[in-house]
């Protein structure tokens, strides 16, 4: 289980918290979504889970153990796929996998067959010799996913995994994530697409101005949007204005 307890992040020079007293539990085997607009604090939460950002206050636990940057055993259990393409454009697909294996000290007899398996799973087995800069956006996303899976993590965390992709590529990524979750992997993603969160997630947390305003199943959130006053993504308007119809809620994309 991933647990956040009173997590706070304030950036140097800021007078407000980017993440403000967030407490959350993500259960093993769950597909969980953080839904909110750009600037809501979703990526900051992901940054702290990846240990790239230090907490200002609070605590993160993985399997009831405090999660620290130096705890490599726990870090191996958790892989993060960032929103931006964190790939070297001058390397081939295969070299990207090899570099990841070396960073984690994986023996060749393990990472070579594992890489072949993952690239096939992600539909990239015929692209091994292709330079990254020649890949489409969808292929780059798939490569980042394959790379993240190389260490055989228990927890997969993705920050806006389909942003900027065409509908076909989005569906392909969704299908891969569903399969991984069905195989028992715990998946946490951030998104500002209500349809994406509803389609994939068992539970959704609404994130607004650094706070979690509601956690519920997609069905309950959608059912309540027409009558239950919840904070929407801009933090000003109520559901009666933005979500007067359930259909609108499903197709709403936060600005």
Locations of the language-model features?
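A short, flexible loop at the N-terminus of ABC-type nucleotide-binding domains that lies
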Residues: 1-4, 8-21, 28, 70-71
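ABC ATPase "signature
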Residues: 215-216
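Conserved ABC ATPase "signature" region
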Residues: 98, 102, 109-127
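Conserved ABC transporter NBD signature motif
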Residues: 58-69, 73-74
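Conserved ABC ATPase signature
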Residues: 131-135
